[in-house]
Amino acid sequence: MSIKFISTPNPIGNFVNVRFTGNYAYISGQGAFDDEGNLITGKVGKDLDADQAYNVARRVGITILSVIKNDIGFEKVKKIVKILGLVNCTVDFLTQPKVINGCSDLF
């Protein structure tokens, strides 16, 4: 599956997309956007099933990669150290790792 990079999204709050310290770049939390540029929302287990949520997490990963591409440049990145994924889900939804794999599978 090919990756279609997006424009770097403008922060919704009082933060920046990238903060540098030494040789490390920290990417702020990112969301997922649909093809029209709208933020995708919903609760897994209620509004989205696991497969839909996997694809939303993949879009988050593409947003992160787009921030790296547009704000840093891939040539400056040697290694991704950590991806932190949070899943907004119902209390009975128990396969959060499957959802986060949508993002992790890109790295």
Give the label of every model feature segment.
Residues 1-81, 89-107:
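N-terminal presequence-like segments and the immediate start of the first folded domain
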